[in-house]
Amino acid sequence: MRKLTLATIAAAFSAVTIVVFGLPGSPATGAFDPDRPNGVEDPCRNVQTAKKLLCPDLRIARPSEMYLDRKVVPGRVVLRATNDIRSRGQGPMEIRGHRDHTFSMNVTQAIQRRAGGYALYPTQARLRFFTVGYRWGGSYWKVRDPLHFELWRIDEKRRRTKLVRTGPKQFYCFRDLERTNPSPRSPAAAVYPACNQNPKVRHVTLGTSIGWSDIYPSTYHLQWIDVTGLRGCFAYVLHLDPGNVLFELDKENNVSQRIVRLPWRGYRHRGC
């Protein structure tokens, strides 16, 4: 192991800017305003601050690969969907967890600086050591509530009017699963691996690089909304960062939807 010198330590600190501010209550008690993630000014949308940063921008693709599942919950009918969280900003979405409880971590967002290194911003996001079951690999350090599955009633103009159901899934990884938008700024190989599975680790880093996606297939654990007994036209919505605890360039691309007719009989039988 390389011996740390005072010069090495000083160099490490010079590569990082730490931004500290007070934060209000957890998003569990109510989402923050999109214009003020975590209840503070967004450095990625402050003109002066953003000039010095390579800010991330996550986007959510429309729900896809949808199908009915009558087996996962006895006596119920659920509509499954694939989600694709796309990283399309100036820099990667990177978050760093630091253990503060037995099975959870607080989260700091690391945003690349144009001059090199990172600026670190505390957030109200949380990581948890979460079990998805043996079939899906056991337990992982995952992000809480980065994406919600929502089902909305719509009017005759397809505008969402009332939230009627939500999906059960709460925990996701941020990782480089598939390079979906290659570009000169997009790394050719994955930088951020699958989520850490060590329950004893004190620190973890999760992220998604520019041009890469974190995709969960419709067959995966809890990728569904219960649609039992519902009839008519609805918007099947994927809502990215619903608590507004991540800093990014644009919050307007954090919602996608697909109009569906229930009972579900496939994409060609909507009539909405």
What are these regions (language model features)?
Residues 1-12:
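N-terminal export and membrane-targeting signals
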Residues 33-42, 46, 52, 90-96, ...:
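Beta-sandwich strand segments
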